From Swiss-Prot:
This is Humanin-like 9. Highly expressed in the kidney, heart muscle and testis. It is found in: Secreted; Cytoplasm. One of its GO terms (biological process) is negative regulation of execution phase of apoptosis. GO terms for cellular component: cytoplasm; extracellular region. One of its GO terms (molecular function) is receptor antagonist activity. The lineage of its organism: Eukaryota, Metazoa, Chordata, Craniata, Vertebrata. Pfam families: Humanin (PF15040). Induction: Down-regulated 6 hours following staurosporine (STS) treatment and up-regulated 24 hours following STS treatment. Down-regulated 6 hours following beta-carotene treatment, returning to its basal level 24 hours following beta-carotene treatment. Signal peptide: none annotated. Keywords: Cytoplasm, Secreted. It comes from Homo sapiens. Belongs to the humanin family. The keyword Cytoplasm applies.
């Protein structure tokens, strides 16, 4: 369960981090 939560968090972070870096 912890692994699943980590993957979800990582995916969410990447999804929000990529557009921001690309925008800058």
């Amino acid at each position: 369960m912890a692994r699943r939560g980590f993957s979800c968090l990582l995916l969410s972070t990447t999804a929000t981090d990529l557009p921001v870096k690309r925008r800058t």
